[in-house]
Amino acid sequence: MAPKVFYISDGTAITAEVFGHAVLSQFPLEFESLTIPFVETLAKAENVKRQINDCFITTGERPLVFHSIVKPEIRDIIYSSEGLDYDFLNTFVAPLEQHLGVSASPVLHRTHGKANHGYEARIDAINFAMDNDDGQTMKHMDQADLILLGVSRCGKTPSSLYLSMQFGIKAANYPFTEDDMDNLKLPEALKRNKKKLFGLTIDPVRLHEIRQSRMENSRYSSLKQCRLEVKEVEMMFKRERIPYIDTTNHSVEEIATKILDVTGLERHMF
């Protein structure tokens, strides 16, 4: 039976999930997880406690409980459950208070709330990424922080959206298609913004597998076509001196981090 995991917060639970996933990824096990955000009242906390206790009674194993709860009274209720508690905020806050000589003054949603100056940057960047996805328009390339290039289904769209959501980076993306292969070159709008260009490539066999799941037994998904497109686009990257990385078997988080590392782009959030 897969170990049970709870991610709990009086906010979005993003912090609890990120830290929890980072810790649990060190173990070669499959986990069954439940995320419970916005536990902002005593009644909600008591309900979560019942869920944790019911899980313990049903399985006979104490579930893992990762939480980032600001309010002490909410946190105390979770502490009193039958779960194994991993409290990220308290783990780091107490030592920091001692080191900084300042008492923490917790404010709910300070990190992810609208009052945060990064909120508007996030929304603007997300809208930009969606409006400039997959070469829909070339009118706004001058406003982009980054323009991702590559063949269809190599990871451009998820990478653009992740960069916008996590870091407030305005990322456009442009695909090179089968029709481009006979005379592959950069459109004028991309040439004008060459310093913003960054390429993504992928192993042709993996690309074939991805495309097969979308358009099985088509020319678009054939291994021959995948090999041709990847080869031609990589040659163009080298010819135009466009930096690029291989996305094969990498998560979108890893791809985004590599892009930031290579380009030196500054995060607009955090």
Swiss-Prot record:
Family recorded in the similarity comment: Belongs to the pyruvate, phosphate/water dikinase regulatory protein family. PSRP subfamily.
Organism superkingdom: Bacteria
Role description: Bifunctional serine/threonine kinase and phosphorylase involved in the regulation of the phosphoenolpyruvate synthase (PEPS) by catalyzing its phosphorylation/dephosphorylation.
Catalytic activities: [pyruvate, water dikinase] + ADP = [pyruvate, water dikinase]-phosphate + AMP + H(+); [pyruvate, water dikinase]-phosphate + phosphate + H(+) = [pyruvate, water dikinase] + diphosphate
Binding-site residues for ADP, renumbered to this chain: 150-157
EC number: 2.7.11.33, 2.7.4.28
Keyword Transferase attached: yes
Keyword Ubl conjugation among record annotations: no
Name under which the protein is recorded: Putative phosphoenolpyruvate synthase regulatory protein
